[in-house]
Amino acid sequence: MTEVLLLPGTKSENSKPPHIVVFPFPAQGHLLPLLDLTHQLCLRGFNVSVIVTPGNLTYLSPLLSAHPSSVTSVVFPFPPHPSLSPGVENVKDVGNSGNLPIMASLRQLREPIINWFQSHPNPPIALISDFFLGWTHDLCNQIGIPRFAFFSISFFLVSVLQFCFENIDLIKSTDPIHLLDLPRAPIFKEEHLPSIVRRSLQTPSPDLESIKDFSMNLLSYGSVFNSSEILEDDYLQYVKQRMGHDRVYVIGPLCSIGSGLKSNSGSVDPSLLSWLDGSPNGSVLYVCFGSQKALTKDQCDALALGLEKSMTRFVWVVKKDPIPDGFEDRVSGRGLVVRGWVSQLAVLRHVAVGGFLSHCGWNSVLEGITSGAVILGWPMEADQFVNARLLVEHLGVAVRVCEGGETVPDSDELGRVIAETMGEGGREVAARAEEIRRKTEAAVTEANGSSVENVQRLVKEFEKV
């Protein structure tokens, strides 16, 4: 586990601890990093109230156990929405198509939150809320506290989203789209734009509320990013210019801080650990596509055949994916299929793992980068095409192996790319991945590391409000 330089707490003997309220968006990739930040604030002497709905309360259990006197859950009933079935309170229950209706549902919590704030004996001095909850900017103006937007995504993606929402007519009428205002002037096919952009614009009329919500983020008093200056300084400077101030805090990768919040976060199944221990350093390809995506039978067949042809050692984590009959027997000794939950970060950081075949979700990207693994990207939806562009073309720590949520890869080509990347042909990208790993680790561990200094700046900003 990476050692973390903790900053002095803000609590004094004669004053109450500062009280912050945190409002995560109920999707694993959004919620867990913000809870990691909450943990760091508690370590520095803050009291934190976390707004959740009943179906998401279980995510707070590790945090409540770690900080029983500092963390309070504020539970509001989940407001209904005609597009959501009863009981749906998290994106994992419906997939990325649930983002917009869940965003709409949570807007209905405005008045209950105001009532809670006004009746609290020690009301919070600031709000940290997810970037999908941009409407909380106006809420904070009404109750008179600053709002800090939390971004569990890259600066690159924020730049792309802002351009798209400010140029709706261009996006709807042009393909590919040339984002001239952005650093490096990237070009994207319409199908590779973030899913929330395409869904916002595919309705009979644009989802103006969601577009407004995102635009509100640029007006927030401050912004906190789970990224690193090492990874995308040009887009950091672009976003700061758009925001018009320096209250932008780049504090990640949060997965490198070693929060200890996720249950068994550092443990690996003994049988898997034994298999990894018996593998040569850097020889294993870890294959996982996140918590939401399940591959089709055709995709699984092609991936399995590609792995088989590559002759590469691998660990393939699956949920309900239909693994071909006989595959596990044919790769016995060289490959493992693991069903269910795996401590991804712990596996990636094992010395035997040298590559990561990933959907390129941002949290997985950060875990891969901080582990020094070469990423073999198969972006499918959401922000993943943007993230893959950053990894492959900007950072040089990844190669693309496939694109698209419905695409079936050519197994011969897939096997060839895997073998080449995990072998001699991947030495250059592996060296680059290790260089970036060292730099991002220094950002969160060294006294003058950029992320360490940004956390200190954030704490001081809270002390001023």
Swiss-Prot record:
Binding site for UDP-alpha-D-glucose: 291, 342-344, 359-367, 381-384
Alphabetized InterPro entries for the sequence: UDP_glucos_trans (IPR002213)
UniProt KW keywords: Glycosyltransferase, Transferase
Enzyme category, top tier: transferase
The UniProt record lists the keyword Transferase: yes
Record carries keyword Transferase: yes
The protein's Enzyme Commission number: 2.4.1.-
UniProt feature coiled coil, ranges: none
GO molecular function: UDP-glucosyltransferase activity; UDP-glycosyltransferase activity
Function: Glucosyltransferase that glucosylates benzoates and benzoate derivatives in vitro.
Family: Belongs to the UDP-glycosyltransferase family.
Name the record gives this protein: UDP-glycosyltransferase 89A2
Native species: Arabidopsis thaliana (Mouse-ear cress)
